[in-house]
Amino acid sequence: MSQKRKHDDTPGDASSASKTFKKHRPFKPGQNHQQTKHHRRPNLSHDDENGRSTNALKSRIRDLKRFLTHMDSVEKHKMSAGARQERERELEACEHELAEKLNASREAEYRKKMIGKYHQVRFFDRQKGTRILKRLKKELSALEDDSKKTALQQRIHNAEVDVNYAIYYPLMKPYSSLYPKSKNKKSSDSEEAEDTGEDSKNSAEVDGPKGDVNMWKAIEEAMQDGTLEKLRYSKDAVPAEPPKKSKKPKAKDSKKEKSVSKTSHDASASHNYAVQDQDEDSDGGFFE
């Protein structure tokens, strides 16, 4: 006969014994039991590559200027010539670094503005130029007459320049379209142009320099020299920094004059009311 297991050997008791009970902390009225808020990590994307933002540079420049002016004004707090020269060098370095960062941010903002402004026109010019280039290459492969190949190869070269014109035109410079549409065309004229065949398209295409002619020739030279990327990111067309607006002290003086005149007018009015009240009181006493 099988023996019965003892009560202590049951698995239920072992599992119950292994369970741990959570201890409840006593409630304190002054203690905040809400979850602790996690502090956000600082966003370093607004800072520069070296970690120093423009705001930090501005505050450092302001502190250095205040420190130097304080040392000049207070005789007791004079510093040695070497320490002062070190502070002045630090101030010049901070001002130079701040000017470079401001120029870089201004150029980036201007580049972003110009890219967004002429993105659609450049895209359409590039699409049309690639279509023309593919068609000309197809014609060259099917052409059997050697006498016409030289002229067709020149047209292919011009089409390649057109495509590079749309891609590598300087981003900072206002874009001049290769295939501008006249604003005075009517809708009927556009519908008739769509119905025409390839012969009319070929006759309408302008072969050779177009758009900004000087830039078209510059891109052709850059293709030979291999400097297309340099031409695209050139900074020659970046506008100069606008001059800072000077404060107008005359406006403040006029405001002060208005306030003074207003106070004098109120004072005279109150004086007139007081005189009138005195007259009324004196008249009443006479008739009594």
From Swiss-Prot:
Residues 83-154 form a coiled coil. InterPro entries: Efg1, EFG1_rRNA-proc. Residues 1-58, 178-288 are annotated as: Disordered. Residues 277-288 have a biased composition (Acidic residues). Transmembrane segments: none annotated. The keyword Zinc does not apply. Belongs to the EFG1 family. This is rRNA-processing protein EFG1. The gene is EFG1.
